[in-house]
A protein has these predicted regions:
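Ligand-binding face of N-terminal immunoglobulin V-set domains in extracellular IgSF glycoproteins
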Residues: 110-138
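Extended, solvent-exposed segments with strong compositional bias
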Residues: 90-111
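Beta-strand-rich interaction surfaces with strong enrichment in secreted/lumenal proteins
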Residues: 44-45, 100-107, 122, 149
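Low-complexity, Pro/Ser/Thr- and charge-rich linker/hinge segments at domain boundaries
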Residues: 152-175
């Protein structure tokens, strides 16, 4: 099995906050996908300033045509809202609209497919980290129809990792153990126990 290792610098919130996660709150929104554009199955991680983009794709089963807009929220490592203001983490303006859409043809149920690529001409991220894209009906900004979460990473350290079936639990059975070393020569980490959060993801 291939494992994906993700390290994110911790930004500690001052107060308890809402934790963001990908979810749909409007029953008219179906088949929400959040992935790397051009890849069939992928975790929504892209490099800051890289060539890849995040694709958010969904179907809206509205009786009539609906226009959707979105806001971008920068999050801490625990997916609570960070203390950064929009001008600090993005170029562009909140409330941009989703302009890529197409009505379904030849189907028994009428719906509209919407597609958003990020970054785009309207909004670009300035910093790495976790992001929550909140989409709402343009006529009612207070009602979020869904939230799409993704991460933008910045390769500031190098990581050497190994995977072994010889673990503290068992040997070559149902568990795996990951060991890794971080080369942070050009990125000082004063308190690694508290300054870093580490996640290990299984790839597919």
């Amino acid at each position: 099995k291939i494992l994906f290792l993700l390290l994110i610098t911790v930004l500690v919130p001052l107060t308890a906050q809402v934790t963001y996660f990908t979810n749909v709150s409007d029953k008219q929104i179906k088949t929400l996908q959040v992935k790397v554009a051009g890849e069939m199955f992928s975790d929504p991680f892209i490099e800051l300033g890289g060539e890849n983009r995040i694709e958010v794709n969904f179907d809206a089963f509205n009786p009539g045509f609906g226009r959707y807009a979105y806001n971008l929220v920068h999050c801490n490592a625990d997916w609570t809202q960070s203390n950064l203001s929009p001008i600090e983490y993005m170029n562009g303006f909140q409330g941009s609209t989703i302009e890529d859409f197409a009505n379904a043809m030849g189907t028994t149920v009428q719906y509209t497919n919407y597609r958003l690529l990020f970054p785009n001409d309207d909004v670009q991220p300035k910093v790495s980290g976790n992001y929550a894209l909140q989409v709402y009906n343009e006529d009612d900004p207070s009602q979020i129809v869904f939230t799409a979460c993704f991460s933008i990473f910045e390769p500031m350290v190098s990581v050497a990792a190994t995977v072994s079936g010889n673990t503290d639990i068992d040997t070559n059975q149902s568990h795996q153990q990951v060991s890794f070393a971080i080369n942070n020569k050009n990125f000082p980490i004063t308190y690694p126990q508290t300054d870093l959060k580490i996640w290990v993801y299984q790839n597919n």
